[in-house]
Amino acid sequence: MKTLLLKRLMFIFLLFVACYSSAQSLRSLPFQKRDSTLIRIAKETLKKKAPEYLIENGAPIISKHRVRYLTPAEEKEVPEFSTFYGAKSGQVYYIVEFPQDESIESFDAGFVAQVYIWEDTSRPFSIALGNSLIMDLK
């Protein structure tokens, strides 16, 4: 009986460790490793969700952003359909932008696609396409 309980506890512990390690924080990575990881995640996301927008016209542009600080009252007013619904004030995210080549094709938004990725979990949470369509990945 004790061994069965011990095995179950060990399994649960390993499950928590595996889940935690899969959500890698980009904060601790060196600059070049972080950028290559962001580009890889963005390409995988586009390949899965919008493969026709995985057009590489030069190197992707990476920019770092922070969710603005909100008062508790302002947080309650964020609509559920918002891309940033549930985000914490000050939470850091990256935008990986795939630039357009206007000599080949021109998009309304001025880029082919943008993938939004959280810094703390390395998870993509939104895609903005060059035709002005936004896809939430929640």
Task: Pin down the residues of each PLM region.
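Short, non-transmembrane alpha-helical segments in secretory-pathway proteins
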Residues: S25-S82
